[in-house]
């Protein structure tokens, strides 16, 4: 069973995001900001939108390398509305032993429903509902 996983969502607009799973539990961070890849420093001053249109694979590579350094996931799963073909990634700044397995998903709708279900369960457990 995978313990540490990152799911990257790359839409056609620049609202890229990521879900982080730590020890098989969704990690949100103290202010629920964990996974907001669009705010990484190399995405500043509108460059993110330009890079997304010009070189979406390069943008994903930078995001994956950042995740490897900060989070060190075993798997990175990607859903991209921009890259239609599965790509091989050039993660040269990350030593091979620290590179994650990378997989692609075709349909994110099912995962969104599962995530919403899990959020509702979490709120019930915490007594928020």
Task: List PLM regions with ranges.
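ATP-binding/phosphotransfer module of carbohydrate and carboxylate kinases, centering on a glycine-rich
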Residues: 26, 44-129
């Amino acid at each position: 069973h995978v313990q540490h996983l990152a799911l990257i969502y790359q839409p056609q607009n620049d609202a890229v995001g990521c879900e982080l799973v730590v020890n098989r539990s969704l990690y949100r961070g103290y202010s629920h900001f964990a996974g907001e890849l669009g705010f990484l420093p190399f995405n500043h001053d509108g460059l993110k939108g330009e890079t997304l249109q010009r070189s979406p694979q390069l943008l994903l590579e930078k995001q994956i390398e950042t995740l490897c350094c900060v989070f060190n996931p075993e798997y990175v799963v990607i859903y991209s509305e921009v890259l239609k073909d599965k790509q091989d990634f050039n993660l040269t700044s990350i030593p091979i032993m620290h590179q994650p397995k990378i997989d692609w998903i075709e349909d994110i709708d099912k995962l969104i429903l599962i995530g919403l279900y899990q959020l509702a369960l979490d709120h019930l457990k915490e007594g928020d509902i």
